[in-house]
Curated annotation (Swiss-Prot):
Cross-referenced PANTHER family: FLAVIN REDUCTASE, FMN REDUCTASE (NADH) RUTF
Protein name per the record: FMN reductase (NADH) RutF
GO molecular function: FMN binding; FMN reductase (NADH) activity; FMN reductase [NAD(P)H] activity; riboflavin reductase (NADPH) activity
Origin species: Escherichia coli (strain K12)
Catalytic activity: FMNH2 + NAD(+) = FMN + NADH + 2 H(+)
Amino acid sequence: MNIVDQQTFRDAMSCMGAAVNIITTDGPAGRAGFTASAVCSVTDTPPTLLVCLNRGASVWPAFNENRTLCVNTLSAGQEPLSNLFGGKTPMEHRFAAARWQTGVTGCPQLEEALVSFDCRISQVVSVGTHDILFCAIEAIHRHTTPYGLVWFDRSYHALMRPAC
């Protein structure tokens, strides 16, 4: 059996462009957030998406206990916020760097996000070092910014909506 080594896998995955998201939660275990690109649609019936979260991450206990989250998809120009939520910055400083609303689940919803998906975690599957969080979408909020943001080849890239 051919086993792919970790670095080869990571290098190959860098070729897959993905939206940049800040995943947030709030509840009995407190407010927390992190940057993620491992987010995707599962089904539209019922509307469900998934988020992958490392069980060794400092935010894991909050998401595991709160069982709610908001996927805030970033737009171009929000790279500094992505970097802030992707580092070791204390939570209160992360959240102080942007304007937030409270979503229907009680999770922080980024006011300037391209789109926000407010969710309840409906199922968790553990694979290797990560939990795959299946999330039932309870509300969606869209913003009208024309520029998206993707992570590709280990750097940020802006995307522009085509003119209609």
